[in-house]
Amino acid sequence: DYKMYPFTYPPFGAWVLSPLTWFDYETAARLMIMAIALQTAVIVALIGRSLGWSWGSAFAIAPWVAILVQQCLEPFTQSVGFAQVNTAMMALVMIDVAAPPSWKGRGVASGLAAAIKLTPAIAVLIFLLRRQWRSAITMVATSLTVTLLSWVISPGESARFFFDAMWDPQ
């Protein structure tokens, strides 16, 4: 019930999700559920790669493991049930975490995730604990840049989110 669970994402998150408003509720929910399935498969493939699987093995196994994960693990079943963005945020963070430390774009995907929904910002600790300073700085810089750009374009919505909605426990 959308009245029970209000939308409290930063303006950038609203922008990213706004194309779903082009569809009726049922179609938008189905699109989100399909996206969650794809994102879960990507997450599984990235985990497989980080465990040393070949890309072929990772992508051959990922869809089947993703189905199992979505059916058995509560965070995934809840994401599907509510058509939430949690798996997208996890996929963005996993792209950075699983990338080689030498990749210069490492941190961008996590920074975008943190600009969409604040929770993924905790992923900066992964880079800090690994002493991957460039990735941590890239993540923070990406998130701040996107958030500040959002503020410039949507100052009223940004102020409402950061000074009101973000602090409202309901």
Give short role names for the model-derived ranges.
Residues 104-128:
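Membrane-interface alpha helices of multi-pass inner-membrane proteins
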Residues 1-106, 130-170:
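Primarily membrane-embedded glycan-assembly and transfer machineries that use lipid-linked glycans
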